[in-house]
Amino acid sequence: MSAKEVKFGVDARDRMLRGVDILANAVKVTLGPKGRNVVLDKSFGAPRITKDGVTVAKDIELEDKFENMGAQMVREVASKSADAAGDGTTTATVLAAAIVREGAKAVAAGMNPMDLKRGIDLAVEAVVADLVKNSKKVTSNEEIAQVGTISANGDAEIGKFLSDAMKKVGNEGVITVEEAKSLETELDVVEGMQFDRGYISPYFVTNADKMRVEFDDAYILINEKKLSNLNELLPLLEAVVQTGKPLVIVAEDVEGEALATLVVNRLRGGLKVAAVKAPGFGDRRKAMLQDIAILTGGQAISEDLGIKMENVTLAMLGKAKKVMIDKENTTIVNGAGKKADIEARVAQIKAQIEETTSDYDREKLQERLAKLAGGVAVIRVGGATEVEVKERKDRVDDAMHATRAAVEEGIVPGGGVALLRASEQLKGLKTKNDDQKTGVEIVRKALSWPARQIAINAGEDGSVIVGKILEKDQYNYGFDSQSGEYGNLVSKGIIDPTKVVRTAIQNAASVAALLITTEAMIAELPKKGNSGGGMPPGGGMGGMDF
């Protein structure tokens, strides 16, 4: 085990504080509509330019082990805020640095760190209660667009794309962000349920130009097993032919004489049919087939349930207004499932998302939820260069998470004003002793920093701006640093999702309180480099003359 270096008390906190400040100073310049860019060096390829706080924080690694520990703890604040709300990472970093800075002074002055922590916790509870009380529900598309615009650093186009996407796929729908191959940013919406399996044979194609199968008013057979025996299928095929409607078969696989017969019938025009492999694997496949069954009002045919293929009737098949199948994907639009059944399934999947501990499972469950609940929207971000596209994609990602958070918990005025107003509520907060009171005061001072920093980044005097905002009692009154004017921020469209502001202060205070109560730090000593000994003389190949 290698030797360790140990630092105590003031010495430990000073080194840690230096690391916190280095990281916070790099991140805070990105805050607000007039925040600056940060350029990150990459080991290969062009440098990356970003205005995303968490991206900057994740790129910082300091040489001094103790400084680095402080920086990494604050980086954790940014990461946690990004995970929980998808935005507010810079605000959280600024708050954490301010609380640590003031807290370290109080500890140095001889106050009890544990009481300071209790005071900080009391203050945060009061702030969260105030935010929730003043939060306003998001109802219109316009408000969703405003949230997206603010989070994308004032890019109204991104805000509009996001509100359009949410309008089309619903609040539960999946919105994914990809890099486009062109200059333009575009929105592509897939309505209904789509899964990543295409037709088994190209002979099923009905639209030769687009190389895809297009059926209207189709029956859908959902089967868990392989289909290779024709005799099993015959009774059902005859029943479907008499209705004159097309049939889509979703099964583990269709092969042998069953596939050959389907293809021949399709080519002769006797039966409109197409076969698709079932999506997913193992238990996930069972669940996805059940989703398709519920969406289309059919039954998943499984031997576990004691249903044999030859006994399947038309009533067991799903139905959909439109089915499109290309080489890679199958899309089912307007399934005939009952609304109540679909809602029950959605609630069940939501409960599973809450319970699961695996990120991979959570992601897959969310995909299933979106497919059932509305659809999938893809925003393809364009730009002139790769660097520009990456920078813009960062902002679209932030904005997407912010709009979701706004729909979830509502909105408060932006520009750091909600936290400023909450700081006023801390003035009369009751505490058990003076040290706890100082803890509350530390949070109260820190809450002015986001508004102050936004003003500083816009070239204004932070203290003057904060003073002027607090002179007025109106909750929504604040400073618009984009235009340099004061006014009602909500009516100007300068708003923050409550969830983003709430997670920022909770995460910042949680990590900052841990840093304040730190009394010792332990790090590995750097290894002393041994100077490598000379190489032994090489044995030449004897007796060889050149």
From Swiss-Prot:
Going by the UniProt record, its keywords in alphabetical order are:
ATP-binding, Chaperone, Cytoplasm, Isomerase, Nucleotide-binding
Q: What GO cellular component term, any one, is given?
A: cytoplasm
Spell out the subcellular localization from the entry.
Answer: Cytoplasm
Tell me its EC number(s), please: 5.6.1.7
Give the main EC class.
isomerase
Q: Where is the composition biased (Gly residues)?
A: 530-546
Q: Where is this region: Disordered?
A: 527-546
A GO molecular function held by the record = unfolded protein binding
Q: Which residues bind ATP?
A: T30, L31, G32, P33, K51, D87, G88, T89, T90, T91, G415, D496
- Catalytic activity, reaction form: ATP + H2O + a folded polypeptide = ADP + phosphate + an unfolded polypeptide
Q: Which InterPro entries match?
A: Chaperonin_Cpn60_CS (IPR018370), Cpn60/GroEL (IPR001844), Cpn60/GroEL/TCP-1 (IPR002423), GroEL-like_apical_dom_sf (IPR027409), GROEL-like_equatorial_sf (IPR027413), TCP-1-like_intermed_sf (IPR027410)
Tell me which PANTHER family the record gives.
60 KDA HEAT SHOCK PROTEIN, MITOCHONDRIAL
Stored HAMAP family? CH60 (MF_00600)
Q: Which family does it belong to?
A: Belongs to the chaperonin (HSP60) family.
Q: What is this protein called?
A: Chaperonin GroEL 2
Please name the source species: Rhodopseudomonas palustris (strain BisA53)
